[in-house]
Amino acid sequence: SPFDTRLRLGRSQTRKESIIYFQLDFSEGIDRQALFHILSFISETKNTEVIFGAFSASQEQMEEVESLVNEIIKTQIDTDSLEKGIDYGRAENPLEENGEKELRFQFVNMNDDLDLIKTLEFVRLIVDLNKQPHLYTQIAGISAGIPQINQVETVYVEHLKNGYLISDVTEFSKAAHYYLDMLKEWNQALVYSIDKIKEHTGQRFLDKLHQWIEEVTDVKG
């Protein structure tokens, strides 16, 4: 089976915030418009965060994308709208120890599949708008029951089944709302992922997956 049994289904339902994983691919270059649309979505949608993830990128490449993101925020998005909500009842000082407010995005440079598994643990939505979607990210997404947004059709992601196929980055917000606003659509993607795994795995693993789907369904009702 190509699917990874180390990933646990439905973990994101245990978190209040919806975490989006955005796949970076420096071989294709960085799409500024795509970065803008996802940052804009995060700034306008409460309880959302984004992880910009890359595989084995150089320090220069990571600095480049961080600089570009900061530039987009500075020129096109209100920085305050990207701040994490602060629980004043628990924190005497609303600022972080370094004096900076915590923002709802982060950068992760991963070395192997174990890093990706750790990164995806509580992710609610995967976004890969590259011309060649990252194969292992797609497989990992199915293994964890996470719906995916792509611009290119692949054998792993089917439109409105376990993902959303957009023709242009301007459609990102519509696709993201489809899976983040309503639990029904997200659960359907989770069930579809189980069926996808069923095609490639034995009964023992399948029983374990059904146990997981029952648990996460009970949690959310």
Where are these regions (language model features)?
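Conserved catalytic-core segment of nucleotide-activated headgroup transferases in glycan assembly
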Residues: 3-104
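Short acidic alpha-helix that forms the nucleotide-activated donor recognition element
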Residues: 93, 112-123, 143
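Acidic, amphipathic alpha-helical patches
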Residues: 113-116, 137-138, 162, 172, ...
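Short alpha-helical segment that forms part of, or immediately flanks, the ligand-binding pocket
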Residues: 117, 135-143, 154
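Acidic donor-binding loop of glycosyltransferase active sites
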Residues: 118-133, 146
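Short hydrophobic beta-strand element within catalytic cores of glycosyltransferases
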Residues: 145-151
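A charged, aromatic-enriched C-terminal amphipathic alpha-helix characteristic of glycosyltransferases
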Residues: 170, 181-214
